[in-house]
């Protein structure tokens, strides 16, 4: 089947799949680790020129990221073994205060608190 459709096979490490999923999460999707494998493979094939910029590609997400909350939280808390989390968005604990939340947001985006 693979040969009939001129297909290729690629692999992804735990770090590659975790970072690929987190990278795509920043676009508004919330990917599961399995989809992270497909995304990581896609990125590697693009980098090698196997998939060209003009090519059309479909990546099918196999599950929602909410089914893998331990993986997601572990990534952003930098707790996954053997993974350098390039796109981690570390949780920030704040008091129950509108002003504290507002200040944290403004500080994060590099503007003065209003």
Residue ranges and their predicted role:
Residues 40-114:
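Phosphate-binding loop/pocket of nucleotide- and phosphate-handling active sites
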Residues 1-52:
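Active-site-adjacent helical/loop segments in soluble small-molecule enzymes
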């Amino acid at each position: 089947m693979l040969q009939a459709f001129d297909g290729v096979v690629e692999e992804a490490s735990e770090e590659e799949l975790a970072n690929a999923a987190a990278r795509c999460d920043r676009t508004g999707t919330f990917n599961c680790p399995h989809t992270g494998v497909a995304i990581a493979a896609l990125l590697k094939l693009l980098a090698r020129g196997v998939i060209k910029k003009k090519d059309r590609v479909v990546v099918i997400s196999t599950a929602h990221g909410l089914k893998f909350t331990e993986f997601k939280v572990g990534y952003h808390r930098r707790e996954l073994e053997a993974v350098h989390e390039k796109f981690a968005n570390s949780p920030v604990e704040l008091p129950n205060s509108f002003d504290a939340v507002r200040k944290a947001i403004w500080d994060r985006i590099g503007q003065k608190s209003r």
